[in-house]
Amino acid sequence: MKSFTKILFSTLLLLAPIFSCKKSDVNKNFPTVPVNITIYLTTYPYTQLNSIGNHAYVSNAGYRGIVIYRKSLDEFAAFDRGCPYDPTATGSLLEADGSGLAMTDAKCGSKFSLYDGTVINGPATAPMKSY
């Protein structure tokens, strides 16, 4: 009986971390706007998207503009430039940092991965809004 209790306790102890993990919070307060854009990789400023790892901004789309990131030869990521921490804050706008691998909001200090939009650091807990 003691052996069974030990096994049960050990199993529960090992499974606890698995079930306690949660996905990043999704910002349900981020404004939802329709997006329907076409870009041409032969037209400036989108020509920089011909190289993997580069990004380009699209003005007048999304809530605060969109950043497009070239992940691979046939895969792109598109995110809103509004900071998920407080998307309606005046002056809040995500800008690419010097590495070109992350976006930072100068107002709140949150930093996000351009590859997948996840939070790197800062007060934000929700990832960048993806399109």
Where are these regions (language model features)?
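Sec-dependent bacterial lipoprotein signal peptides
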Residues: M1-C21
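Short cysteine-rich clusters marking metal-coordination/redox-active sites
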Residues: C83, T104-D105
